[in-house]
């Protein structure tokens, strides 16, 4: 399994080499623990950095590294992505962002999960309509949101543009990694919002 992005440097903070990090992991204490060696990737270059301090600041982290001693060195990290191997938790039934990106999006209409399953897998009419592909996942206080590039030939007013779909069980009842697709049961009007 490929390494995952666990955070990204936004900007320097202060004059002593601290950086603002936008975390993209549910395991912040483990990933950014003091003494943890992080792999920073930036414009094709990689370097190892050792965490010497981490504190929360609003929805982000302020992190210091042994190798970064001042603001100029911290500025050189702007935009760097921290990559790490996945942590495996057998009790976790969630999905990593990279597993969702690239999945085809099948619309079965505004129906319940059982009807969605019958339409997607048992041939019940009307069959699902392939509307596009997941191109990104964003995370906010209300949960994850899928960024979907709607196919230019889709029969939707948003054809050729990007729409946002809340990644909630009521709207995305089926994620089928084996068939590289997910099924959506959007409320009326959701797919028309660009």
UniProtKB/Swiss-Prot annotation:
GO terms for cellular component: cytoplasm; ribosome. Residues 92-190 form the PRC barrel domain. GO terms for biological process: ribosomal small subunit biogenesis; rRNA processing. Signal peptide: none annotated. One of its GO terms (molecular function) is ribosome binding. It is found in: Cytoplasm. InterPro entries: PRC_barrel-like_sf, PRC_RimM, RimM, RimM_N, RimM_N_sf, Transl_B-barrel_sf. Keywords: Chaperone, Cytoplasm, Ribosome biogenesis, rRNA processing. It comes from the Bacteria. Binds ribosomal protein uS19. An accessory protein needed during the final step in the assembly of 30S ribosomal subunit, possibly for assembly of the head region. Essential for efficient processing of 16S rRNA. May be needed both before and after RbfA during the maturation of 16S rRNA. It has affinity for free ribosomal 30S subunits but not for 70S ribosomes. NCBIfam families: 16S_RimM (TIGR02273). The PRC barrel domain binds ribosomal protein uS19. Belongs to the RimM family. This is Ribosome maturation factor RimM.
């Amino acid at each position: 399994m490929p390494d995952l992005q666990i955070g990204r440097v936004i900007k320097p903070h202060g004059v002593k080499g601290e950086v603002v990090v936008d975390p993209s992991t549910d395991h912040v204490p483990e990933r950014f623990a003091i003494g943890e060696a992080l792999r920073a990737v930036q414009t094709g270059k990689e370097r190892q950095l050792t965490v010497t301090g981490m504190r929360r600041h609003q929805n982000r982290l302020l992190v210091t590294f042994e190798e970064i001693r001042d603001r100029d060195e911290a500025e050189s990290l702007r935009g760097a992505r921290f990559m790490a191997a996945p942590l495996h938790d057998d009790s976790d039934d969630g999905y990593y962002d990279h597993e969702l990106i690239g999945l085809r999006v099948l619309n079965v209409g505004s129906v319940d999960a059982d009807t969605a399953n019958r339409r997607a897998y048992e041939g019940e009419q009307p069959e699902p309509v392939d509307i596009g592909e997941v191109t990104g996942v964003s995370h906010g206080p209300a949960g994850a949101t899928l960024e979907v590039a709607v196919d230019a030939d889709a029969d939707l007013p948003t054809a050729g543009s990007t729409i946002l779909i809340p990644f909630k069980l009521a709207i995305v009842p089926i994620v089928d990694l084996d068939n590289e697709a997910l099924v959506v049961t959007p409320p009326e009007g959701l797919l028309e919002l660009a």
